[in-house]
């Protein structure tokens, strides 16, 4: 009887750990760049490209390509979410308001921008912890290497892949994924 109780307890605790580990992209709430709460569950049924961005980086011109990608595919259940972060070389020093003005004025950004967060280190945002840790996303460890690293999330909220910061938003990997090829 003790053996059965032990096995049952072990089984139930394993199930609890697995559900806690892979709670899914859609379970997170984030803050928009203008301070509103946004539930990622609103994106169920859409492919999502998550990208950490910075205004004073050599890769900042990717904003233009990201906007072009968004314009091309936004009517095909695709969305981009930008997360400003100041983790690399202090290249995103501005306030949320300053970042929003910069993106709109210089690149015409209309894809959703979120409030500035940390994408690595001790103060990493919960969403980025999930994006970067296999134990949580169930797929792969993918530490953010620099500004403009991209994560691909499918319609069900499952982690699909990541794309290195220097790769174009129009890389074959991203476009093929969006188009379902």
What are these regions (language model features)?
Residues 129, 133-181:
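Thiol-/selenol-based redox modules, centered on thioredoxin-like
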Residues 46-47, 56, 60-84, 104-107:
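Conserved helix-turn-beta segment immediately C-terminal to the redox Cys motif
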Residues 24-25, 97-146:
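Short, internal strand/loop/helix patches
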Residues 32, 52-56:
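Amphipathic alpha-helical repeat scaffolds
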Residues 18-41, 125-126:
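N-terminal "domain-start" segment that seeds a small globular fold
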Residues 77-94, 110-121:
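Thiol-based oxidoreductase modules, predominantly thioredoxin-like and allied folds used
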Residues 1-23:
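Bacterial Sec-dependent N-terminal signal peptides
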């Amino acid at each position: 009887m003790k053996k059965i109780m032990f096995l049952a307890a072990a089984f139930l605790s394993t199930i609890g750990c697995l559900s806690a580990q892979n709670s899914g992209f859609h379970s997170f709430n984030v803050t928009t760049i203008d301070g509103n709460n946004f539930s990622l569950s609103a994106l169920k049924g859409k492919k999502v490209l998550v990208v950490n961005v910075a205004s004073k980086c050599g890769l900042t011109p990717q904003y233009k390509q990201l906007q072009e990608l968004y314009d091309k595919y936004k009517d095909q259940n695709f969305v981009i979410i930008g997360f400003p972060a100041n983790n690399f070389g202090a290249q995103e020093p501005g306030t949320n308001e300053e970042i929003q003005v910069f993106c709109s004025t210089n690149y015409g950004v209309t894809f959703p921008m979120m409030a500035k967060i940390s994408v690595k280190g001790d103060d990493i945002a919960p969403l980025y912890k999930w994006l970067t840790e296999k134990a949580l996303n169930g797929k792969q460890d993918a530490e953010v290497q620099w500004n403009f690293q991209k994560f691909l999330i499918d319609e069900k909220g499952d982690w699909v892949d990541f794309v290195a910061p220097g790769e174009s938003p129009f890389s074959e990997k991203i476009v093929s994924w969006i188009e379902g090829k």
